[in-house]
Protein backbone atom coordinates (compact mmCIF):
# COMPACT_ATOMS: atom_id res chain seq x y z
CA UNK A 1 0.00 0.00 0.00
CA UNK A 2 1.41 3.38 -0.97
CA UNK A 3 2.28 5.98 1.65
CA UNK A 4 -0.17 8.61 0.39
CA UNK A 5 -2.85 10.50 2.32
CA UNK A 6 -6.28 9.93 0.74
CA UNK A 7 -7.48 13.40 1.80
CA UNK A 8 -4.52 15.74 1.24
CA UNK A 9 -2.54 13.69 -1.30
CA UNK A 10 0.60 14.18 0.78
CA UNK A 11 3.30 11.63 -0.10
CA UNK A 12 6.93 10.95 0.93
CA UNK A 13 9.42 13.72 0.18
CA UNK A 14 13.18 13.35 -0.23
CA UNK A 15 15.95 15.39 1.30
CA UNK A 16 19.18 15.13 3.22
CA UNK A 17 20.25 14.18 6.71
CA UNK A 18 22.82 16.75 7.81
CA UNK A 19 25.46 15.74 10.33
CA UNK A 20 27.27 18.17 12.61
CA UNK A 21 30.01 18.34 9.95
CA UNK A 22 27.28 19.09 7.35
CA UNK A 23 27.79 15.79 5.51
CA UNK A 24 24.70 15.06 3.42
CA UNK A 25 23.12 11.61 3.16
CA UNK A 26 19.85 11.07 1.30
CA UNK A 27 16.72 10.28 3.30
CA UNK A 28 12.93 10.21 2.97
CA UNK A 29 10.50 12.35 4.93
CA UNK A 30 7.41 10.17 5.46
CA UNK A 31 3.92 11.59 6.05
CA UNK A 32 2.27 11.00 9.45
CA UNK A 33 -0.16 8.35 8.14
CA UNK A 34 -2.85 6.59 10.15
CA UNK A 35 -5.60 4.17 9.19
CA UNK A 36 -8.87 5.46 10.64
CA UNK A 37 -12.49 4.30 10.45
CA UNK A 38 -15.15 6.97 10.11
CA UNK A 39 -18.88 6.42 10.56
CA UNK A 40 -20.78 7.82 7.57
CA UNK A 41 -24.33 8.52 8.71
CA UNK A 42 -25.69 9.06 5.19
CA UNK A 43 -24.46 5.63 4.02
CA UNK A 44 -25.09 3.91 7.38
CA UNK A 45 -21.62 2.28 7.33
CA UNK A 46 -18.00 2.71 8.33
CA UNK A 47 -15.43 3.97 5.82
CA UNK A 48 -11.74 3.22 6.37
CA UNK A 49 -9.31 5.88 5.18
CA UNK A 50 -5.51 6.09 5.22
CA UNK A 51 -4.78 9.69 6.05
CA UNK A 52 -2.42 12.08 7.78
CA UNK A 53 -3.09 13.96 11.00
CA UNK A 54 -3.81 17.05 8.88
CA UNK A 55 -6.31 15.01 6.87
CA UNK A 56 -8.14 14.16 10.12
CA UNK A 57 -8.30 17.86 10.98
CA UNK A 58 -9.75 18.63 7.54
CA UNK A 59 -12.47 16.01 8.14
CA UNK A 60 -13.20 17.59 11.54
CA UNK A 61 -13.59 20.96 9.83
CA UNK A 62 -15.50 20.06 6.64
CA UNK A 63 -17.27 16.87 7.68
CA UNK A 64 -16.85 13.33 6.40
CA UNK A 65 -19.57 13.62 3.72
CA UNK A 66 -17.95 16.64 2.03
CA UNK A 67 -14.49 15.06 2.10
CA UNK A 68 -15.78 11.76 0.69
CA UNK A 69 -17.48 13.67 -2.14
CA UNK A 70 -14.14 15.33 -3.01
CA UNK A 71 -12.29 11.99 -2.93
CA UNK A 72 -14.89 10.35 -5.16
CA UNK A 73 -14.81 13.33 -7.56
CA UNK A 74 -11.09 12.59 -8.08
CA UNK A 75 -12.09 9.08 -9.16
CA UNK A 76 -10.80 7.23 -6.10
CA UNK A 77 -12.96 4.26 -5.08
CA UNK A 78 -14.02 4.09 -1.43
Curated annotation (Swiss-Prot):
Keywords tagged on the record: Ribonucleoprotein, Ribosomal protein
GO biological process, any: translation
Keyword hit for Ribonucleoprotein: yes
Residues covered by region (Disordered): 1-20
InterPro entries to which the protein is assigned, alphabetical: Ribosomal_bL28, Ribosomal_bL28/bL31-like_sf, Ribosomal_bL28_bact-type, Ribosomal_bL28_sf
Gene Ontology cellular-component terms listed: cytosolic large ribosomal subunit
UniProt similarity note: Belongs to the bacterial ribosomal protein bL28 family.
The protein's name in its UniProt record: Large ribosomal subunit protein bL28
Species name: Actinobacillus pleuropneumoniae serotype 5b (strain L20)
